[in-house]
Structure formats: C-alpha cells, structure tokens
Amino acid sequence: PQFDEFGVGIIITSYNELQFYLSLFNQQLPIESQFIKQLADSLNAEIVSGTVQNVSDATTWLGYTYLFIRMLRNPVLYSIGVDQLEQDPLLQQHRGNLINSAAIVLEKHGLIKYDRRNGNFQATDLGKIASTYYVSNTTMSTYNRYLKPNAGEMELCNIFCLSEEFKNIVVREEDKLEIAKLLERV
C-alpha cells in the first residue's frame, strides 16, 4: 500500500496449501515488510532517478515505506529496542543507520559514490545500468569480478548464469530432456 495503511492481495496456491493460507487469513496476522532485503537496490534506483541525493533525503524517503510502518508497529521484529523507540519515536537514527549500511554496500559494489562526511550520493555508470535494467547490486558485483574484455561465449554464459536474478528459476520436468541434449553438445 503506497500511501495507505492497508492493501488487497490475491493468493494463488495449490489445494494442499489452502488450509495454511486460510488459517493465516482467519488469525488476521499482519504481513511484515520484506523491503529490507531489497533496500540497497531500491536506494540505488532512487539515487539514479535523482529523488534521493543524500542520507537525509534517503532517511525521509524510507519514512514513506511500508517497512517504516511495520517498524513502528512491531519494533522488536526489526531489532528496535523499546528504549530506542522511546528516545527516537520516528526512528530517524535507525532509518539513517539502515540507509548508511545500504549506501556502503552500493559503494562497495561500485554503483554509487558515497561521501560519508557530508552524506552525499552520486550515481555511477554501473549504478545507472543496474537501475535501468533491474540488475541487483550483488549481480553487478559478480559481473565486475568475473567479466573480462576477452571472455568467450561460454565464459559469458557461465558468468551470466551466476546472476542472482536466476537463482529461483527451476527447470521444468518436461525441459530436462532438452537441456540434457544441449549439455551433450557442449
């Protein structure tokens, strides 16, 4: 829910798992944010678009997310102590720390330049490529590590197969025979 506190979801599942989802629905358990896993990549996109130019902008931007709402409602789950919440009810410091950590990761992978003294961000060409083509920062790091100017076709295929974006792709049973035939030719 972009600007609201609730949303509508559609669950498509197998009959075997239907009871599990019905029990979740009946208990009215809140759906927790998974945004933290993609924070660095989302921050990179905001930096590239020019929406976020420094830590202060990014901290404000993070305050508009569902993650922020869930951190306020369930602070313990997000490693926020009660005393920390009392001292900083809007979690300004915690959000700043999350942004700082994400910026360090992006800088390490060569996607941004991060001036820690004044908190300014600057997108790099690699960061622009990653944002434009939805390539994760970890995949860009892999490419930086393994891509060489003289890489052959097989080497390029192997490197691209290391992409994080492919990690959840499962080979269908009906495709296994065709893949085995392809492997015989290699």
Model-assigned labels for residue ranges:
Residues 1-29:
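Conserved segment of the helicase C-terminal RecA-like domain
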Residues 14, 185-186:
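Low-complexity, interaction-prone regions
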Residues 25, 29-179, 184:
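C-terminal accessory/connector segments of nucleic-acid motor ATPases
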